[in-house]
Amino acid sequence: MLTPVVSYSTVREVKGPLLVIERTRGVSYGEIGEVVGPDGEPRKVQVIEVATDYAVAQVLGGTLGLPSKGSTVRFYGKTLKIPVSEQLIGRILDGKGQPRDHMPLPPPEDFRDVNGEPLNPYSREYPEEPIETGISAIDGLYTLVRGQKLPIFSGTGLPHNMMAAQVVRQSTVRGSGEEFAVVFVGIGIKTEEALFFMDEFRKTGALRRAVAVINLASDPVAERILAPRVGLTIAEYLAWQLGYHVLVVMTDMTNYCEGLRELSSGKGELPGRRGYPGYMYTDLATIYERAGKAHGKKGSVTQFPILTMPNDDITHPIPDLTGYITEGQLVLSRAMWGKGIYPPFDVIMSLSRLAKDAIGEGKTREDHKDVANTLIAAYSKALELRNLATLVGERNLGWRERRYLRFADAFEQKFIKQGYYERRSFEETLDIGWDVLSILPEDELTNARPQITQKFYRRHIFESVAV
């Protein structure tokens, strides 16, 4: 039990989830303590602003029923730390790191600061090994790399929750002796969504290798800010101390940013773009930059954050700033979803900046880079020809152009589209890629090396497709 070192009965104001404490001395940013109201119930607090004669603290348990008069705040001179253990795998926690599954916490192996320890840039190792998600659009075109941070840009009503559950369930790393774990962080999600994830993880057995940190929309907003940091702290312990390759799936980062805006407004700060605080870029970086690999460490931390773009606007501050920090983005398309295609990836708008270094012989398969480059180039050309066909009619196109239209249909229906419970290996994904590419004439596949085309091209498929 921590011994309080400073105690104040000078709470000036309770403002939303915040306390304003007057005449403070020696209180530090990030310091933890507790506030006790007239009812005698202690609630954990964390300092989020320090001035010469006052401090602002967020109440992690909410301020409902907490008056300013008669409340006492005690500070402990320490930052917020949570107990971590390998036995947390298989457990469900809340945004503060406390059990949500009605079981006691396992004996702690260590206590870790939720703000983490920044990786020295010199100690970082360049990510070059893939994670197999079992989803062709990701594995085949925009491969997720161990130590990468690759977000999904989604929209309201799109199936990003299904994708998050599928990635948690299916993802793995290849290689004997490689330990793999998933940390799932639900940020400000509805009870219905939380029940979906928990039922899915339990039913499929995914929870046996996962830690779930669930922050509900009804939980205090201060806990929403804490939840991703709690999840990442657990992930870092598993990676750096125990050698796990950890995939951190976080949804929905838009809820996190809305919570950040709410706290900023409560502190009376000047708003930035669209009301978000001017330091949102820096704040997001403190989360995203905790991904990576380190020299001399066996494990890695990979981030797969999901955010919903307000009004499908990719220039909105949340996706805009996220794109600056992360190493690519996977964009979901409302048009593809409207055509009944799951997962509804927008292939042209998506990008993985590190994929090129994690694919190929010895990592996935020798033809992987050729397949990815050729599929994207051919699909881009096919989309242009689709627009042309709506103007002049498909019959007025040449036979090669009509082949591209057949290719685009097959690419969407066979390669991109797959079942929610369908898992494809790298080899299966690449084979399907060659199946759809073989609809095109062999001399059109100029983005693939000739020796690769000669080895994998399926001429019988080309001959069987009528145009």
From Swiss-Prot:
User: Which molecular function term from Gene Ontology is one that the record holds?
Assistant: proton-transporting ATP synthase activity, rotational mechanism
Name the Pfam families on file: ATP-synt_ab, ATP-synt_ab_N, ATP-synt_VA_C
GO terms, biological process: proton motive force-driven plasma membrane ATP synthesis
Highest taxon listed in the record's lineage: Archaea
What InterPro entries does this protein map onto?
A: ATP-synt_VA_C, ATPase_F1/V1/A1_a/bsu_N, ATPase_F1/V1/A1_a/bsu_nucl-bd, P-loop_NTPase, V-ATPase_su_B/beta
Matches recorded under CDD domains: ATP-synt_V_A-type_beta_C, ATP-synt_V_A-type_beta_N, V_A-ATPase_B
Q: How does it sit in the membrane?
A: Peripheral membrane protein
Keywords for this entry? ATP synthesis, Cell membrane, Hydrogen ion transport, Ion transport, Membrane, Transport
Chain positions covered by the region annotation Disordered? 95-114
Q: Which GO terms describe its cellular component?
A: plasma membrane
- UniProt keyword annotation of Endoplasmic reticulum present: no
Specify whether Transport is a keyword of the entry. yes
This protein's major location comes to membrane
Question: Where does this one sit in the cell?
Answer: Cell membrane
Reported function? Component of the A-type ATP synthase that produces ATP from ADP in the presence of a proton gradient across the membrane. The B chain is a regulatory subunit.
Q: Which PANTHER family match?
A: V-TYPE PROTON ATPASE SUBUNIT B
In which family does this protein belong, per the annotation?
Belongs to the ATPase alpha/beta chains family.
**Subunit text:** Has multiple subunits with at least A(3), B(3), C, D, E, F, H, I and proteolipid K(x).
This protein is called A-type ATP synthase subunit B
> Species name for this entry?
Pyrobaculum calidifontis (strain DSM 21063 / JCM 11548 / VA1)
Gene encoding the protein:
atpB
